[in-house]
Amino acid sequence: MGRFIFISFGLLVVFFFLSGAKGSTCPFHWLPMYGLCYKIFDKLKTWNDAEMFCRKYKPGCHLASLHSKRDSIEFAEYISDYRKGWGNVWIGMWGRKEGLTCEWTDGSSTTYVAWKQNLTDHYLNKDLFCAEIVSYTGYRLWNKQDCKVKNAFLCQCGF
């Protein structure tokens, strides 16, 4: 009887590790949230180059999408802990100057936004804008920025 329990327990442990292997852990210095992993990259890139970097890092990766105030707080703490420099950070939202809609690069819904008050129209002469998390707000609020500006960036990936 004891041997049966020992073998059953061993098989259960093996099954647990095999069934949870995909998507259950993030690499070192990545933030695990909602079954995805997030990482700040300090290399300064334009918004398009940052999105391409994320996509090339691993298939299915994109610039990060934030969907709640709780997300904003978690990311603000993570960025503050791991960002080596100072400055704004690209996220995966973009939009057109004409029109009221924005889109996430991963195709998820845009029901939550955290625009700072008195948005700076750095993209005024451009058709498109890209969203950045603003450093002087403690990385909690966003700004619309010219997509050609170079910033650090936050990628999201499934592992």
From Swiss-Prot:
Disulfide bonds: 26-37, 54-155, 61-157, 130-147
Cellular-component GO terms for this entry: extracellular region
A Pfam cross-reference name: Lectin_C
Keyword annotations from UniProtKB, A to Z: Calcium, Disulfide bond, Glycoprotein, Lectin, Metal-binding, Secreted, Signal
Keyword hit for Heme: no
Signal sequence extent: 1-23
Organism: Bitis gabonica (Gaboon adder)
Name under which the protein is recorded: C-type lectin 1
